[in-house]
Structures are given as structure tokens and as C-alpha cells.
Amino acid sequence: MQASLPKTIVGLGGKFAYPNLAEETPDTLTTLYEFDGFNLVWDSAMGIDNGSYERDHGIAFIGNNATLILNRGGWEVIEERRSKNKVAKPLVKPTDRGLDKHSQNFISAIRANDPSFVNCSIQE
């Protein structure tokens, strides 16, 4: 797409799923970004029973020929019924959540007594 900044942005949302929670961020939001030659729609919602595509969290990229769905459980491509393009459809499930690698890296930094060994910053 090679787009820079959108020409216009319009958003609509509010606190509809959990209106009594003490949070300021909307739990429901739809935003339309207008670029030269295409539009992009961002939908965000909390409180939908099992969520879109039978997943309780994640993100979907909807295109002309297929939809790419990603979450912490993996990814899946759902092909449009009328698409002439054949696309891969694996659901890739990770064997771990990366916690083992983070723990090993942290222990290595402690053993070396060198904080620069840590691959990510330590937040207080």
C-alpha cells in the first residue's frame, strides 16, 4: 500500500459493554482512515461473548481475497468463497508463550552480572 498519513480520520465509540467501569477508554470503537486509493477500518470491541471468528481476542485483516486472523494462539487465513486465489490456511499454534526464553535470558544476565545482556527493558 505504501501509504503515508491518512487524509481524514473519523471515529465513533463509547462505553457500551461495561458503562459503569472506572475507565476512560471506550470499550467499543470503530475508526475509518481514508488514504489515497483505499480506506482502512479499525474495529475494537469488548464484552462480545466469544468475539469475532470464534476467538475471544485477536486482530483480523480483511482483504479482497481472504481474511488473516492473528492472536496469541496462532494465525489462520480464511479464504473468500469467490476468490480465485488459493491461499494457505494453517492454524499455527505456538508450543510456548516465550516465557522460557525470557527466563533463560534473564538468568544469563544475572549470572554474568551484566544488565546489558537482557533482551528487553526491565520495567518497575
Where are these regions (language model features)?
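Contiguous beta-strand/loop segments that form the cofactor/metal-binding neighborhood of enzyme cores
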Residues: 1-124
